[in-house]
Curated annotation (Swiss-Prot):
Glycans are attached at N136, N322. It comes from Mus musculus (Mouse). Residues 1-22, 107-133, 301-334 are annotated as: Disordered. Its cofactor is Zn(2+); Ca(2+). The active site is at E248. This is Matrix metalloproteinase-17. Residues 11-22 have a biased composition (Pro residues). The conserved cysteine present in the cysteine-switch motif binds the catalytic zinc ion, thus inhibiting the enzyme. The dissociation of the cysteine from the zinc ion upon the activation-peptide release activates the enzyme.
Amino acid sequence: MGRRPRGPGSPRGPGPPRPGPGLPPLLLVLALAAHGGCAAPAPRAEDLSLGVEWLSRFGYLPPADPASGQLQTQEELSKAITAMQQFGGLETTGILDEATLALMKTPRCSLPDLPPGAQSRRKRQTPPPTKWSKRNLSWRVRTFPRDSPLGRDTVRALMYYALKVWSDITPLNFHEVAGNAADIQIDFSKADHNDGYPFDGPGGTVAHAFFPGDHHTAGDTHFDDDEPWTFRSSDAHGMDLFAVAVHEFGHAIGLSHVAAPSSIMQPYYQGPVGDPLRYGLPYEDRVRVWQLYGVRESVSPTAQLDTPEPEEPPLLPEPPNNRSSTPPQKDVPHRCTAHFDAVAQIRGEAFFFKGKYFWRLTRDRHLVSLQPAQMHRFWRGLPLHLDSVDAVYERTSDHKIVFFKGDRYWVFKDNNVEEGYPRPVSDFSLPPGGIDAVFSWAHNDRTYFFKDQLYWRYDDHTRRMDPGYPAQGPLWRGVPSMLDDAMRWSDGASYFFRGQEYWKVLDGELEAAPGYPQSTARDWLVCGEPLADAEDVGPGPQGRSGAQDGLAVCSCTSDAHRLALPSLLLLTPLLWGL
């Protein structure tokens, strides 16, 4: 995979496919050897048997059957080999030469290259593609590799980013969930795992995924647990999990194999594709997935494919000793009952901070996880003894992130602290004692600091406090003067938080919108009524909630139709280049 896995949605590893109950060996040898004639040395009987089994497995010959197998002709076999060579970018000789046999032994996806029945049609017609009828899809890693240097958090992070490759350019949204109701179930299995596509040990086929549809396996993606899965490894014998996963998830959303050598959907594994945080699909794959689902609003089909990269691109961190990142339950604040220390929009996503933890929402207001992530492990450079923050915001002047605690502040580029911090808040001409909230108002591109009933207005571009401040609040009618948090959001509105409620102020307005305050927990943190179609996971403290596989689970809903999610991957950082 790495470029093109096969099969029911999965790439395969190195090694030849096993011979199956195909054509009678003697007839195979006679048919294929006769085709070689004097032009080339006759292939070995073993290669002939494996070759025909391979051609049948991947769609170039009808399924092997002793009754019909005897009717195979030299011409049909030659055509099948020629089609395979064309698809694989080889010279079309029509015989099992060394290059053809070598390609057959290349690690690849389990799915066939040609649709069922294509061999019997005079004009090969691709059946209509299958696709998901909904745009919000859930996923879950149900089983993990047993003997792998990759920890669970790394595996989940790689799955997240492999799916993100497809959702970045289409209207599809992927959400990790706990429980058995996920649309895309991900497993690491060995040998026969009861889906009709048994794995074959190290090498051979390495993974597969099932196309969308009404069947119970639709979207499910399986990886061979006997493969040496790697990530950012110099080991040439390893199988890059991210590259294979991108290919397989292409199948899971409806894409079949293609012959284009640069496509990720080519069936053969071609090695790593690069950093998950920066990888972009080849143009051929973009066009094909756009034909299925259309283009995401934020993406232009004619946009330049190579987008500028940040000077210091973020890295996917390695897991600490492969331990679970789920914090001890006694330390975790509950998102549905807590009021928050700070709320901020960062790179278009919302962050809710409480104690040493934070929750994160995507641009579409989908909660990434029901469990919080640990602040110190994500924002590298915050003091380990820091037990909370007072306020956080992203500067509009340079898009750096500023954290406030007491009379000190820290500046981060992406998730790494800048040198020379912390510094005193007096740099902002603020009095000692800290602030309660901060946000940048889109209406005038000014930053507002709040403390008790006072507020200050600051120009981030000139790094100066505007004259005449502090002023007595509130500035916006209907919004309380003493705030816990404030945030500018991607819809252009500003949001103000106090206790467990929030107020919305439309861009340019000076009073709260009608109907506010509303519940922060319900509208932002997925603490409403259970989803009508959600799996009942049993009673719990907040609606229908409980625990599964050691993870907190909650089936809740909001006006954004959010899905239940398990604990956040601490190794799934933001893609800061958004």
